[in-house]
Amino acid sequence: MNTHIKTFEQLTTKELFNIYKLRVDTFVVEQQCPYHEIDDIDLESHHIYLQQGKDILAYCRLYKQNDAYHIGRVIAATKRKGYGTQIMKTAIKFASNILHTQSINIEAQTYAKKFYEKLGFVTNSKPFDEDGIQHIKMKYTVK
């Protein structure tokens, strides 16, 4: 299993295709959220993913917006294998050690709140609707 952290420009067309396919399969098809999955944030993000052979096991993107770092589009292709935890820990470590941020923000789907709390994120908003799915804002403070 290999971990990759790449900017948009560093991704090959095949890597980008596999990332977009996983995201569309998860967010558009599985979660029935027919909204724009590909956006301009991709151009400014670090794309972080775990890969085994040709398969992407987990993915997230890390980006800076309004002077704050954010993690989004978190996916584990197979649930309950630890891939989601591994990709989040990689993103947090990269953000704190390489990008030198003191905090990281996420907008988590409410059902995943406990997953993010185990990683050290704290809820800092009431639930809100985004594209028909309940979310909460959460923040991680680097220790």
Regions inferred by a protein language model and the residue ranges of each:
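Short beta-strand micro-motifs in enzyme catalytic cores
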Residues: 44-48, 69, 134-138
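A conserved beta-turn-beta hairpin within the catalytic core of GNAT-like acetyltransferases
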Residues: 64-72, 79, 100-102, 130-135
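Residue-level recognition of conserved beta-strand positions in structured domain cores
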Residues: 73-74, 140
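Conserved GNAT acetyl-CoA-binding A-motif
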Residues: 95-109
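Conserved catalytic-core motifs of GNAT/GCN5-like acyltransferases
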Residues: 117, 122-137
